[in-house]
Each structure stands twice: as C-alpha cells, then as structure tokens.
UniProtKB/Swiss-Prot annotation:
Involved in mRNA degradation. Catalyzes the phosphorolysis of single-stranded polyribonucleotides processively in the 3'- to 5'-direction. GO terms for biological process: mRNA catabolic process; RNA processing. The gene is pnp. This is Polyribonucleotide nucleotidyltransferase. Its EC number is 2.7.7.8. Keywords: Cytoplasm, Magnesium, Metal-binding, Nucleotidyltransferase, RNA-binding, Transferase. Mg(2+) binds at residues 507, 513. It comes from Campylobacter jejuni (strain RM1221). The keyword Protein biosynthesis does not apply.
Length: 719
C-alpha cells in the first residue's frame, strides 16, 4: 500500500506492507531519488533491569550511490562516524516517546538503499523510522517528525536541500511530536567573503584571494524564532503522519511493567534514614558514583526488620527517596545538592600550556569536572579524509575534535576501549561549537584532543571551554573565545526550575539536558535532549537566557586566563606559504613524484601543492630547513637568466661518478652551493659537506661527482 504525502516542502512516498513484513513495523520511503527502509523489531520477553533496551542502527549502503566499498574488504563493515551520529539523532528523537514500563529489547534499523545528493538523509531517515515505529504494536501517542532549518540572506528556510545548506549560515535540526519539542541540534555555519587581488611576486605574478570570515552566531531571540518555525512544521508533519497511518497501526497488546511500590520500606527509610540520605546526596554531588547509596542500603539490609526485604527493593526505594529529596529541595527551596543557587556556575580554574612539548594545552576544571584539552597543528597530509555517501571524492577534514572518557574519570576500573557513540557525540558537539571561531584560511590542520580526567556532569562543555583556550595556547588566531554550559530542568506538579551548569546527579534525576555553547555575541552550537516527552517555548526561552548569563560569566574568566597565555613558539611547527607559476608545479613534482620526494627527504619538511593556484606550502620544525627547501624550489622553477633550472636542461651524458673537476662556485643557497663543472653544467655541493668552508661566489673548488640522479649532479669536495 502506497501513500504520497506533501509536507514541509517535500514529497514523501511511503510503502507499507510491501517489504520486511516479519518486522513489527516497516516502511519503504522514497523522497526524490533517495530510498530508505526503516524497520522495527522487538523481543517477546521483557528485561528485568529498569531501563529502556532500545538500539538504533543507521546503515548507508555503498550501492545506494553506485559505489563499491573501498579497502581490502569490499563490503560494509563497522559504521562510520557519520552513520553513528545519525543513529544517535534518531535514538534521541524517538526514545522519549516510549511509554513508562516498556522493557522489551527493541531494535530500529534504517538502511539507505538509494541516495540522492539533493535529499537530506538525516531528516528523511528519522521520519521513516518514526512512521515504522508508529505502525508497530509498540504504544506511541503520535508519530515524531523531524525538520531542518537553514538561514540564507537573513531569512529562515524550512528543510533546505543540501545545495541550499552549503549557502546557509545556520544548521538547525529539530524533532518533536505535535506541538512538543523532543530533540534539538544546532550549529552556526561561518561564511567567507572572497576578494580577488593581484599580487606582483618576485617569481610569478599571481591572482589570489583574500577572505574575511563571520562566525554567524545566533542570538537567543533568533533561535526562538527558528524553533517557532520548526515547531509549526513538526505539528504539520506529525498530524499528517497520524492521519495517514493511524488506521494501519497494529493493535497493542504489550504488557507494561508496573512500577513496584514498597510502601513499608519507603515509610521506614523516610522515617529513619532521611539524614543519612541527605548526607549521601552531598557526597554524590561531588561524584557520578552511587557508592554512598549502596552503603546505606547495606546498613539497612543488616537490620532485623529488613530480613524479608530484597537488596534490589531497598536500593530502588532509596533511589526514589533520593530523587524526591533532590527535586523537592530545588523546586521548594531553590537550593541544589551542592548548595548552589539555581543559576550559579561551579568554581572554575584554568591552566594553560602545562605540557611542555605539546603545541598547545589547557587544563580546564569546573567543580568536579576536569578536561585536559590538547591542540596539535599539522600539514595538509594530516587532515582526516572522510568518504561520504553522496560525495564522489573523499572530503578533507582540517579541524578535528576527539573526546576521550576513561573510566577513572568517575572512579571506575574499566578498560579503555575504542570510542563509542557517547564519545563521538560529545566530540562532534564540541567541534560544532568551536569550528566557527577558527578561520577557515588558517594554513594548519588542527586536532584537538579532550582527555576527561574527572567527570561530574557537563564534560562536553568543559571540552568546549578548554578547547577554545588550547587553540589560543597553540597560537591559533581564533576569532573569539567560545564557552559552553549545560542546563537542566526539574518539572513537577506544574512547577519548574531551570538549572545552570548541572552536575551528574542533576542530569540523572532531572528532566532535560540542554547544552549551549557560543561567544559573547551569540550561540554557535546547542543540543537538547528531553525526558519529559516534550518542552514548551516559554521554558526553552528561560533556559536560553539563563544559559547566556552563565556563558558570559565563564567567558569573563576565560578572557583573564587568555591574557596569561605564553605561546611556546619553540615547539610549534613552522610554515612558509608562497606562490609560483602554476605551470611550474609539474617541475616541483618531477617524474612520478621523484623531485618532491627528494626535497622532502633532503630537508625534512612536508610540502603541499595547489596546482590551480600555484601555491606552495612548506611545513617543518626548523625555519632553516623550510627556507632551504623554499630556495631549492625557487631555483627549480625560476626562469630568470643566469639561474639554472637544474642540470637536466644541459647535456650530462659525458659525466660519470667519481669524475673530478676544478669547479667555480656560481651560486650559494642555504642548502648548498652550485659549482660549475664544465660546459655550463652545475653540481650541487650540499651545505652539510661544506660547513667548515667560508664559500663565496666565483671561488675555485676541486670537487668530484658523488651522485647523478634525475638529470641532476651532486658533488663532494676532493680530499
């Protein structure tokens, strides 16, 4: 059965009861030339643990874009980072709608079978998964709808295609159901204004471009305006899906777990252990571990009255009392577990460049959350190559943020493994926040690594703060400092409280995790996950403005720390950027790359070439090596009279290894001297072989040929 729905600028075609009929729910969705299959499957037996056993997989098939997977294994293997991040978006959007007490292991799989470069696969995949879930026998009140908002020439655009998104200064992804928002991801997109200028250079006149960059932060009011547009579109989409598919939804006969109450245990604990629990809460405010509650549970279990009580029932009841005390204290007294007011940021300490041999480093500590963020600068060859499904060629990622969360950061003895979804998600959020502050024309590739050394909430935002200062510490001319803060929400009995800089305890027992990052001029990135089943605009507005207050407080502290930064110039890589005649690039490369390999090996540098612009970028650890390599390249490409392009332009057929000549020094360069042998043919006497001599032009030297390679002659001094 096929349904065609015109909604939010898109024509979406759904086929139900056509494929994957053994699944609990399945749809084959088409939009443009993109086709995705979304399926939902669940087990019949509930898990005993008190959590939602939901897994989401998003898989891009290479054949969807007419490709064969690269590498030795010609099939899809582990998911790429992009696939993992899309799976997280789908998971975070759908998870809040599962009913309380649902405990069946459930898997949602979205497979991209055909990929149209013009279609937004993230939005399409979420909507397909939402409809498949709604069609299943899992009780859902309404279908979720996802939309993307862009901004071009100051105007907000609903569901921009990929081409429009390239020209957008905003990427806002929102998911919700009816008039409630469930998940938000936003990033500001910097734009470049290009100006062509003509430069008269010593070796080649070139037409080059200069650019100026705008970070394009959004104000809180602009974000709310964009969210209002998204909310209306979500309502339209959610209603359209419900109208089309409600009659096809399977009847739900799923049994939900009833929350087990232990009134006797609850009364006993509230009457006898309130003081100990409050003390435990104070301790837990300093750590993400629950060991304090376990101690109380053990103490209760040893009592005579508790002989008939299971350890699980005692622990569950303790957790409920703890949650009730924490939330009640916040809502009724405006006081938090660690004694802070609702809008108070934890104490901050900052140290920079504490690692003497790293390019830039920052130890950022906020309360009991600590991030060591390290910046490393590299050449173009250090960029991360990413193979995207809808791109013909791999793209180069020149700004990377890696986030690591070892077990010891929360006092756990767990093995350090490859990064999981959480690490990838937190690193991606920090990258989105910091990216607009880095000039896209900065010549170095940048890698930031965040090592979380201690965690009690908001470690991703500590990564943003530490990362911004680590860039400064590495001498990166970032446009503005960027800070981040995590906001929380407690909502109960029509009362709510917004919390600034939440700790782990408040994240666990709260109703929202809302991370906001930006400069003093606006927001560069935000991410919201809600546990309530939706949030209204008024609450969101308060959270945004309270986050601004906290962000500016943090930025003031960071600005003072930035003034004290001493850049360690000695360890920073050196770089020389210059232009040559683009037609001469082939001379620098040489036959099969022999010449450029020779230069790299001889001078210990890395070289990047732009064939179209004639730009040459040389990077290395020593200025002398870079200058010598530059002079060597200029000598190769120079067309001025009196300067030899190299012995390959002369007939060297009569020269042999070991031949001796009384030569004349014709030119001295930092890397050596060019000695004329005979018939205008030069040999290079490398500087390493003539350091003890004070050579001058026209000086007579006795030399012998030590190497003939690629039409060039190298010589040594005769003994």
């Amino acid at each position: 059965m096929q349904y065609s729905i015109e909604i939010n600028k898109n024509t979406e075609i759904f086929n139900i009861d056509k494929v994957a009929k053994q699944a609990a729910g399945a749809v084959l969705m088409r939009q443009g030339k993109s086709v995705v299959l979304a399926t939902v499957a669940r087990e019949e037996k509930q898990v005993e643990e008190d959590f939602l056993p939901l897994t989401v997989q998003y898989i891009e098939k290479a054949y969807a874009a007419g490709k064969i997977p690269g590498g030795y294994v010609k099939r899809e293997t582990k998911p790429s980072d992009a696939e993992t991040l899309t799976a997280r978006i789908i998971d975070r959007s759908l998870r809040p709608l599962f009913p309380k007490g649902y405990a069946y292991p459930t898997q949602i799989v979205v497979m991209v079978l055909s990929a149209d470069p013009k279609v937004d696969l993230q939005v399409m995949s979420l909507n397909a998964a939402s409809v498949a879930l709604y069609l299943s026998d899992i009780p859902m009140k309404a279908p979720v709808c996802g939309v993307r908002i862009g901004k071009i020439d100051g105007n907000f655009i609903l569901n921009p295609n990929n081409e429009e998104l390239q020209n957008s200064t905003l990427d806002l992804y929102v998911a919700g159901v009816k008039d409630e928002l469930l998940m938000i991801e936003m990033r500001a997109l910097p734009d470049q204004k290009e100006n062509e200028i003509f430069i008269e250079a010593p070796y080649a006149d070139v037409l080059t471009q200069t650019t100026s960059q705008n970070m394009n932060e959004l104000s809180e009011d602009e974000i709310l305006e964009a969210l209002n547009l998204a909310q209306k579109a979500i309502l339209n989409g959610s209603n359209a899906y419900e109208e089309a598919f409600s009659k096809h939804k399977k009847n739900s006969q799923i049994e939900l777990k009833n929350e087990i109450e232990y009134p006797e245990i609850l009364a006993f604990i509230e009457n006898n252990f309130q003081k100990q629990i409050k003390e435990a809460i104070n301790q837990m405010a300093k750590s993400e571990r629950a060991s304090e509650l376990n101690k109380i549970a053990k103490e209760i279990s040893n009592l005579e009255i508790a002989k008939e009580w299971s350890e699980e029932s005692v622990l569950n009841t303790l957790a409920k009392v703890k949650r009730k005390l924490i939330r009640g204290q916040i809502l009724n007294e405006g006081k938090r577990a660690d004694g802070r007011s609702l809008n108070e940021v934890r104490p901050i300490s900052i140290e920079t460049n504490i690692l003497p041999n790293a390019h830039g480093s920052c130890l950022f500590t906020r309360g009991q959350t600590q991030a060591l963020v390290v910046a490393t600068l590299g050449g173009e060859n250090d960029a991360q190559m990413i193979d995207l499904l809808t791109e013909k060629n791999p793209i180069s990622e020149r700004f990377m943020v890696n986030y690591n969360f070892p077990g010891f950061s929360v006092g756990e003895a767990s093995p350090i493994k490859a990064p999981g979804r959480r690490e990838l998600g937190h690193g991606n959020l920090a990258k989105r926040a910091l990216y607009p502050s880095v000039d896209e024309n900065y010549p170095y590739v940048i890698r930031l690594v965040s090592e979380i050394l201690e965690s009690n909430g908001s470690s991703s935002m500590a990564t943003v703060c530490g990362g911004s200062l680590a860039l400064k510490a590495a001498g990166v001319p970032s446009l503005k400092l960027v800070a981040g803060v995590a906001m929380g929400l407690i909502f109960e009995d029509n009362k709510y409280a917004v919390l600034t800089d939440i700790m782990g305890l408040e994240d666990h027992d709260g109703d929202m995790d809302f991370k906001v990052a930006g400069s003093k001029d606006g927001v560069t990135a935000l991410q919201m996950d809600i546990k309530l089943g939706g949030i209204d605009q008024e609450t969101l507005k308060q959270a945004l403005y309270q986050a601004k207050e906290g962000r500016i407080h943090i930025l003031n502290i960071m600005e003072e720390a930035a003034k004290e930064i001493i850049v360690n110039e000695e360890v920073l890589p050196k770089l020389e950027l210059f232009s040559v005649d683009p037609s001469k690039i082939v001379d620098i490369i040489g036959q099969a790359g022999k010449t450029i390999k020779e230069i790299v090996e001889k001078f210990g540098v890395s070289i990047d070439l732009d064939r179209e612009k004639g730009e040459v970028k040389i990077a290395g650890s020593q200025n002398e090596q870079i200058k010598a390599a530059k002079d060597y390249i200029i000598n190769i490409t120079s067309s001025q009279k009196g300067t030899k392009k190299g012995s390959k332009d002369k007939d060297i057929s009569g020269f042999e290894l070991g031949q001796e000549f009384q030569g004349i020094v014709k030119k001295i360069a930092p890397f050596g001297a060019f000695v004329e042998l005979k018939n205008g043919v030069d040999g290079l006497l490398h500087s390493s072989k003539s350091k003890h001599l004070n050579l001058s032009e026209n000086q007579s030297l006795k030399v012998k040929i030590s190497e003939i390679k690629n039409g060039k002659i190298s010589v040594d001094l005769c003994e």
